[in-house]
Amino acid sequence: MQRLNGRIGHAISRLTHIHPDQSGIYPLSDGLDAFAARMKLADLAEQTLDLQYYIWNKDMSGMLMYSVVQRAADRGVRVRLLLDDNNTRGLDKILLALDQHPNIEVRLFNAFQTRAVRAFSYLTDFARLNRRMHNKSFTIDNQATIIGGRNVGDEYFSAGGEQLFSDLDVLAIGPVVEQVGRDFQRYWDCPSVSLLAQVVPPPRRKNKNTISSKMGQVSVDPHAERYVKRLEQADFFVRLQDGNLPFIWAKTRLLSDDPAKALGQVADKALLTSRLKSVINEPEQRLDIISPYFVPTRAGVEQLIMLAEKGVRVAVLTNSLKANDVAIVHAGYAKWRRTLLQHGIKLYELKRDSVTDRQPRDRGLTGKSGSSLHAKTFSVDSREVFVGSFNFDPRSAMLNTEMGFVIGSEELAETIHGLFIGTLNQNAYEVGLDEHGKMYWREHDGDRVVIHWQEPQTHILERWFIRALYHLPVDWLL
C-alpha cells in the first residue's frame, strides 16, 4: 500500500513512478466516502473533469454534485458531462444552465427526440431506446478516476431517507486511468451521442441562475446541512487529510462495451461478457458473485453448474424479493433457484430491513433503513476481481453498454470476499432445500436462527405475481 497526499498531479506521479506497470486501487464501499471522494477530486481538478453516468438525480446529493461541477468550471476546469437520456426527465433546465457555462459541455446518449411524452417515443422507437448507456465514470485531469456501480443520487450516497442502495466503487490512479480517458472519448464522439442543443430547445431567456436557485433551496435544508457535516467527517476525508489514503497496487485493465452496441452493431465476441471470459481465468476454487439483478438464463445456469461439478464453490449474493426494486427481474432469477441449489450453488438474498436512521452506518455491502443491494462485483479464487456497472442479466450482456475493471489482486479479492462473508450472517437470508426438496430461507436474527418457508416479508399476492412472471418470454429484456 502507498499513500496519496498533496496536489493531485504531483502526488500521483510520484506514486505511479514507483509502480510503473500497476494501478493504485482504493475501494469505496461506504456511501459517504463515495460522495466525499468525488467532491474532493472535483475540487482538486486543474484541467479536465469527464463525467459519464446513467442516472443523475435532481435531489440533494445530485444538486450538491452539480454545484461542485460548476465550481470547477468557474475556476477554469474544462467539464464534459455525458448522460444517458433515459433518466433526465425534469433536468432539461438544469442541463441547459450547465451547458451555457463556457467551460461546460453537456451531451446526451441515445436521446429522446420527444421531451414531453417519452412513453410515446418508446412506442415508436423501441428498438433504439431500449438500449441504454449504463456506464459510470468520474475522471479528473486524466490522473484519477472513480468507476463502479453508483449513479448520482441520494440513495447511492447514504443521503436518502427510507431506501439505501448498498454499492461499490473503486478510486483508481495509474495506467488504467488513461484507458478510461480513451474510452470516454470514444463514447463522447460516437453516433449515439447528441449535443444538448440538438434535442433540448433553448430557453427563452438565460437561465444561468437555475442551479444557484436550486442550491439555495438545498442550502437551507437542515438535512442537507447535516449531510455536509457528515461528509466532512467521512473516512475518505480523514484519511486524505492525514496523508493516509492506502492504495492497493495491481495490474488493472478496463473492459468496456463498444458504444456501437447501442446500435446493435457489435459482434457477440466483442461484447464485454465475451471479453471477460477471455481475460479472467476460469475459477478453480471459489467464485463469489454480487449482483443486484441476477438473471442467469439457461446458458448461465449451465455454466455455473459446470463449475460446481468441477469442485468450485460458487456463491451468489443478490436482492431478496422485498429488497428488489424491479419485481420482474426477481422472477427471472427466482425460477432458477431450485436448479442452482440442487447442484450445490450457494444462494444468499439481502434482507429488506426497517432500521432507524439512528443506527450506526454499516461499512460493508449493506446499509441502514431498508437496504437494497446495488453493488456489481465478482471475485475469482483469491486472485482476480471485477468491479463495474455490469449486472448478471441479459440486459447488461446484450442491450446496455457497460464497463468495469478487472483487477489482479489477491489483497482486493480477499477484501471483497470479506465484505461478502461479513454481509451474509446478519444481513442476508441463506436459501436452501430441506431433505424433502422444500425451499427455505434461513435468517440469523441476533442469536436466533429463524427458518422461513415462504419468501420473507412478502404476502401471498406478491408471490403469486412473481410466479406468474416465470412464464413470460421476457428474459432478454431483463
Can you describe what each PLM-predicted range is?
Residues 1-134, 140-478:
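Charged, low-complexity intrinsically disordered terminal segments
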